[in-house]
Amino acid sequence: MTPLVQAEFWDGDPDIDAICRLSKKPIVKFKHFEPFTTYQLTPFNSQNTFLHRSVLKYYSVFPYTGRMDDIWGAYVMQYHFPNSVLFNKATVYQARNPQDLVKNLENEVIGYRNTLNLLNNLKDYMSLLPEKTVEYFNIYQKYFN
């Protein structure tokens, strides 16, 4: 496995979905662990994450996708570079800014409705992303040619 993405965890107030935040209100403190990877497709956060230059053309935080922006970007990157994500211990503490959890939930509905279809048909991701997201990603990728 050649790690091209190193996603480091964070202690404190995690970036989780609104349902979990509303029901659990977690504050986390991770115990020390060794870096790990998986051969499964996995989301990773855009925060506290290091990317090798070779993946930059294929990874972006996608606009017009609600709160799926970094999650769907991570899946698309892994379509092009499978088995390339390494997870590491927490190296930062996150104190989240105040948020409207109902608005967050509304912005997550696109994911509840479309993520499984995206994962099952990842090779066709350009036809599954919102039209404005595809327009953006095409422009973004031109800067790497």
Language-model-derived ranges and their functions:
Residues 2-145:
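C-terminal catalytic/acceptor-binding lobe
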